[in-house]
């Protein structure tokens, strides 16, 4: 019961803080706040540069594969199995899944940088 009360209080407090953090800055908008800051100088050009969607997709793909490798590395220590064959089969399945994902991205031309 104490755990439920603590979780509800923490969830409520976090929700209130997030709402205040999003709504409070929107109340006071003025020119200096909405213009780009360039070390005290007047802005020379537009601060809104076009963003390459291809770069974004390659970056997200890299992050996904990097996260999967980070999950794969501690498997020998995190696994509670006594048999090394089950550990090798689990690692093999994860590596096969990574390889299939990479092959799919390659075939869909998700790794090519040409615009």
Curated annotation (Swiss-Prot):
UniProt GO MF annotations: NADH dehydrogenase (ubiquinone) activity
Homology family: Belongs to the complex I subunit 3 family.
Transmembrane segments: 3-23, 55-75, 87-107
Matching InterPro entries: NADH_UbQ/plastoQ_OxRdtase_su3 (IPR000440), NDAH_ubi_oxred_su3_sf (IPR038430)
Alphabetical keyword list: Electron transport, Membrane, Mitochondrion, Mitochondrion inner membrane, NAD, Respiratory chain, Translocase, Transmembrane, Transmembrane helix, Transport, Ubiquinone
Complexes and interactors: Core subunit of respiratory chain NADH dehydrogenase (Complex I) which is composed of 45 different subunits. Interacts with TMEM186. Interacts with TMEM242.
Entry EC no(s): 7.1.1.2
UniProt name for this protein: NADH-ubiquinone oxidoreductase chain 3
Phylogenetic lineage: Eukaryota, Metazoa, Chordata, Craniata, Vertebrata
Free-text function comment from the UniProt entry: Core subunit of the mitochondrial membrane respiratory chain NADH dehydrogenase (Complex I) which catalyzes electron transfer from NADH through the respiratory chain, using ubiquinone as an electron acceptor. Essential for the catalytic activity of complex I.
GO BP terms in the entry: mitochondrial electron transport, NADH to ubiquinone
Domain of life the protein comes from: Eukaryota
Keyword flag Cell membrane: no
Catalyzed reactions: a ubiquinone + NADH + 5 H(+)(in) = a ubiquinol + NAD(+) + 4 H(+)(out)
Gene: MT-ND3
Cellular compartment(s): Mitochondrion inner membrane
């Amino acid at each position: 019961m104490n755990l439920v009360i603590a979780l509800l209080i923490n969830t409520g407090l976090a929700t209130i803080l997030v709402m205040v953090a999003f709504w409070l800055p929107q109340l006071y908008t003025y020119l200096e706040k909405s213009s780009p800051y360039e070390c005290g100088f007047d802005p020379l050009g537009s601060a809104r540069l076009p963003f390459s969607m291809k770069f974004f997709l390659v970056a997200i793909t890299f992050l996904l594969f990097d996260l999967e490798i980070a999950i794969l590395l501690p498997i020998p220590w995190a696994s509670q199995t006594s048999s090394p064959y089950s550990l090798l089969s689990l690692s093999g399945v994860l590596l096969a899944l990574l390889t299939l994902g990479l092959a799919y991205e390659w075939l869909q031309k998700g790794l090519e940088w040409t615009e």
